[in-house]
Amino acid sequence: MSLLAQLDQKIAANGGLIVSCQPVPDSPLDKPEIVAAMALAAEQAGAVAIRIEGVANLQATRAVVSVPIIGIVKRDLEDSPVRITAYIEDVDALAQAGADIIAIDGTDRPRPVPVETLLARIHHHGLLAMTDCSTPEDGLACQKLGAEIIGTTLSGYTTPETPEEPDLALVKTLSDAGCRVIAEGRYNTPAQAADAMRHGAWAVTVGSAITRLEHICQWYNTAMKKAVL
């Protein structure tokens, strides 16, 4: 059975939650063994897949979980706004570390390596390709190039202002066009994740609301301070 077919079964049985285990950089939680522990806890709680950044984190996680891992490498480049899996060597390193799916930036922005070249390299390793997109045009272009999974990950992050709510319209547009969509980006409540599924998402990735304690504490502190002012 193909990995996509296996995921279809898991999603039908468990609901389609993917947990992104990416601690705040330099957080006390930003250690491979802690990332792996969070991933294992998420798997035991019913997550159908895990999203992991960084080769060391992926290696540690691969050793303890059996669910599929979506692997990425983030870089801050001087000559490109693209941050997610920008180079061939990133793809190779993630493949060697045990990723099942490799996600890349799928936006139409200046980049060191073309999207189609990165997709071809992912497929060279026999892995599934996911593209993190920001617009319908991004997603449809990546689908035509052969990406099996389209993520709404970068919606709101390629423009000057980032909205507070997730982009359900993008999920629906891409789903209606025949894309296998992972909704991602600002899904901070179970209700929002459920809305994404109702709008046609294949699965939903949740990160900050589950694995970034600093963000969750800030949300509570902000709300509670407003209540007593």
Swiss-Prot record:
Induction description: Negatively regulated by the transcriptional repressor NanR. Induced by N-acetylneuraminate, via inactivation of NanR.
Enzyme Commission number(s) of this protein: 5.1.3.9
Pfam families tied to this protein: NanE
Annotated GO biological process: carbohydrate metabolic process; N-acetylmannosamine catabolic process; N-acetylneuraminate catabolic process
Catalysed reaction equations from the record: an N-acyl-D-glucosamine 6-phosphate = an N-acyl-D-mannosamine 6-phosphate
Pathway(s) where this gene product acts: Amino-sugar metabolism; N-acetylneuraminate degradation; D-fructose 6-phosphate from N-acetylneuraminate: step 3/5
Broad enzyme group: isomerase
Keyword terms, alphabetized: Carbohydrate metabolism, Isomerase
SUPFAM superfamilies to which the protein is assigned, alphabetical: Ribulose-phoshate binding barrel
Family annotation (InterPro entries): Aldolase_TIM, NanE, RibuloseP-bd_barrel
Annotated Gene Ontology cellular component terms: cytosol
A Gene Ontology molecular function term of the record: N-acylglucosamine-6-phosphate 2-epimerase activity
Function: Converts N-acetylmannosamine-6-phosphate (ManNAc-6-P) to N-acetylglucosamine-6-phosphate (GlcNAc-6-P).
Similarity-based family: Belongs to the NanE family.
NCBIfam families, per database record: PRK01130.1
Name used for this protein in its record: Putative N-acetylmannosamine-6-phosphate 2-epimerase
Species: Escherichia coli (strain K12)
Gene: nanE
